[in-house]
């Protein structure tokens, strides 16, 4: 299991990239953490180190893994989960942009109106989910070399 962080500017140009070392879950961890293991791995072992490694402070951190919302306590910026959805699944309390719905961490729900214009600007410049493909490709490249 790996994690990656790519900070892009409004045009989608990369400003900063980090990735974690591979994580290997032991049987003891599976037993001890039980149902909380995935939240722990994503929030503490992957998301936490990535957010702590950043040099620049983004307006918000987008993630395509909802479990990474649990990393919120490790960074100064709001953490927002993005997922593709159809028009029937959209919830009013989230930010809807085209086929995407953005859900801030509960700690950042009060900032939703402040975040909306930033995401609207970003989505007019790039396809919101595309940077996640670049993260995965960069991690794959690093693993193969």
Q: Which residues are covered by each model-predicted region?
A:
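Flexible, charged surface loops at secondary-structure boundaries
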Residues: 52-57, 74
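A glycine-rich, hydrophobic loop/mini-helix early in the fold
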Residues: 2-54
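Short, active-site-adjacent cap segments at secondary-structure transitions
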Residues: 68-70
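C-terminal folded domains that constitute the principal catalytic or ligand-binding module
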Residues: 86-145
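Conserved active-site and cofactor/substrate-binding residues in soluble primary-metabolism enzymes
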Residues: 2, 41, 45, 57, ...
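Short His-Asn-centered micro-motif
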Residues: 63-66, 82
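Structural motif
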Residues: 59-61
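Long, charge-dense
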Residues: 26-35, 72-105
């Amino acid at each position: 299991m790996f994690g990656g962080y790519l900070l892009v500017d409004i045009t989608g140009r990369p400003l900063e990239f980090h990735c974690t070392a591979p994580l290997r879950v032991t049987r003891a961890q599976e037993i001890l953490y039980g149902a909380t293991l995935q939240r722990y791995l994503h929030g503490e072992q992957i998301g936490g180190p990535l957010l702590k490694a950043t040099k620049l402070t983004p307006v918000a951190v987008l993630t395509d893994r909802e479990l990474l919302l649990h990393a919120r306590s490790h960074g100064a910026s709001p953490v927002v989960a993005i997922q593709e959805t159809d028009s029937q699944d959209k919830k009013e309390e989230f930010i809807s942009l085209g086929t995407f719905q953005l859900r801030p961490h509960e700690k950042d729900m009060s900032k939703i109106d402040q975040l909306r214009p930033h995401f609207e600007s970003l989505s007019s410049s790039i396809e919101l989910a595309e940077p996640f493909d670049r993260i995965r490709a960069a991690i794959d490249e690093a693993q193969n070399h």
